[in-house]
Every structure is written in structure tokens, then in C-alpha cells.
């Protein structure tokens, strides 16, 4: 359901999907308490980065490789731009590995 009027688009990204879901539930709780419209959280595609590295440090011997992987999970939430709700959202304790981007749109 699209939100009418000014809205805030909140983009969450991080390495741990449980932490993202926990923060999303806190944002949903704040939206329910303040009575503002909420759309989401929408899970965006997970970005998977793989780095292949040779095991042998000198280049000699058989070619054996290690594959290191990092997955970046993303969520998107639209909320109507209410000053009281946004102040409470900005006071949420966020872990270090979770990034939050808030963009106000009209």
C-alpha cells in the first residue's frame, strides 16, 4: 500500500539478517505506537561477494584455493514522515555492522 504525502524511506543493510529483522521489528513497533503508515519491511536481494585466494603463499605446489564469502543483506521500509516517529527511530540502538540510511521524500 503506497503512502500518501511526505514519507521517509529507510534502507537497512548489514551482514547479519537476524539483526536487520530485529531493527525492522523495532521500527514497526514505533510506527504502531505513533499511529503512522508503514510499508515494509521489503527484503531486497542479498549481495554475495566471493574472493578466491591461493592457499600456497609462494605460488609453488598444487593450485588449491580458499573461497572467502561475505553476504550483505538489505531491507527497505517506507514510513510516513512524522516528526515524533522519526525522532524515536533515530534513538534506536544500532549494532556496528548494521547501516541505516534515512531519506525524506515528498
Curated annotation (Swiss-Prot):
Domain of life: Archaea
Entry annotated with the keyword Ubl conjugation: no
SMART domains: Ribosomal_S10 (SM01403)
GO molecular function: structural constituent of ribosome; tRNA binding
UniProt keywords, alphabetically: Ribonucleoprotein, Ribosomal protein
Biological role stated in the UniProt entry: Involved in the binding of tRNA to the ribosomes.
HAMAP family to which the protein is assigned, alphabetical: Ribosomal_uS10
Quaternary state and interactors: Part of the 30S ribosomal subunit.
NCBIfam families the UniProt entry points to: uS10_euk_arch
Family recorded in the similarity comment: Belongs to the universal ribosomal protein uS10 family.
Descriptive protein name: Small ribosomal subunit protein uS10
Name of the coding gene: rps10
